C-alpha cells in the first residue's frame, strides 16, 4: 500500500 499523507497514520 502507498503511504497516504492525508489520513492519520499510526
Curated annotation (Swiss-Prot):
One of its GO terms (biological process) is neuropeptide signaling pathway. One of its GO terms (molecular function) is hormone activity. The keyword Repeat does not apply. Keywords: Amidation, Hormone, Neuropeptide, Pyrrolidone carboxylic acid, Secreted, Sulfation. Disulfide bonds: none annotated. Signal peptide: none annotated. Pfam families: Sulfakinin (PF08257). The modification Pyrrolidone carboxylic acid is found at residue 1. One of its GO terms (cellular component) is extracellular region. The modification Phenylalanine amide is found at residue 10. PROSITE patterns: GASTRIN (PS00259). InterPro entries: Gastrin/cholecystokinin_CS (IPR013152), Sulfakinin (IPR013259). It is found in: Secreted. It comes from the Eukaryota. The modification Sulfotyrosine is found at residue 5. Changes the frequency and amplitude of contractions of the cockroach hingut. Stimulates muscle contraction of hindgut. Belongs to the gastrin/cholecystokinin family. This is Leucosulfakinin-2. It comes from Rhyparobia maderae.
Amino acid at each position: 500500500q502507498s503511504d497516504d499523507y492525508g489520513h492519520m497514520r499510526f
